[in-house]
Amino acid sequence: MNGYQISKLTVLCFFVNFVGAKAVAQESEDFDAAAKYQTTCFACHGTGQAHAPVVGDIIEWEIRLEKGLETLLQSTINGLNGMMPARGLCSDCTDDDLKAIVQYMIDESQ
């Protein structure tokens, strides 16, 4: 490939990524936290895999909530101690989507 072809490819990739990001943002308006939890988070938070707090375990969630919801959300976004992957491996989730999922798990654990 010459420089011109690489440049066209770069622009195309940027455009596709930009359009995809806008589509994700639009889809988030109708976001279903419970459904996304089932497809993305349940493998760990439904079973305790990798020491994840299990949804419904009041004590485990209370321990985490003592640090505050914002700290819990930042751990979700950035990952934690190599156990919790960044964004919970939900690459199509916005920060607001992740917050909704965290709130769903908290609500189900009280």
Annotate the PLM regions:
Residues S28-D32, G56-I59, I63, K67, ...:
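Residues at secondary-structure transition points
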Residues T40-T47, I101, M105:
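The canonical Cys-X-X-Cys-His
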Residues V54, S75-A100, M105-E108:
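Axial heme c-ligation environment in periplasmic c-type cytochrome domains
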Residues A43-Q74:
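Gly/Gly-Pro-rich "capping" loops immediately C-terminal to redox-active cysteine motifs
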Residues F31-T39:
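Local sequence-structure signature of Cys/Sec-based thiol-disulfide redox active-site neighborhoods
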